[in-house]
Amino acid sequence: MESHRILLADDEPAVIRAVTQLLDGKFEIVASVDNGQSLIEDASRLDPDLLVLDISMPMMNGIEATRHLKKVGSRAKVIFVTVHEDRDFIEAAFSAGALGYVLKPRLATDLLPAIREVLQDHTFVSSPICMEEARKSGRPDPILEAARSNL
């Protein structure tokens, strides 16, 4: 097991279970929470290395919680695990301080590579997002450029 400490945040118990199973024996899960306010409290108290969280959560969404944590000096790296594929969410996530963006349907294939990349301060974006952006535009895109090594 690697010594990296991970805090999970998602309001869907099935997602928490799936992520826990994927990470079992590989990383230390220090806590799991189901809303943005609890995320802020536990991240401040437990000082994890990595946050794996959803965007859409009650009380405070993941993007707002990430902005708050970064503002108060949290050193935790952030990976969003979400169903949101549109560019506005992606840009907001990275603007808030995320380094990773994994689509929930690709959780089983993308989460571990995303964690490895993000823990090395690299950016990771699920491939379907990159493919869609490439289809829309023939010119280089900042999101595509950041994720090019993950295609």
Please report, for each region that a protein language model flagged, where it lies by residue:
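Conserved sequence signature across two-component system core domains
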Residues: 9-10, 33, 51
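Acidic catalytic/metal-coordinating carboxylates
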Residues: 35-38, 60-64
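Short amphipathic alpha-helix used as the core "switch/output" element in two-component signaling
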Residues: 41, 63-75
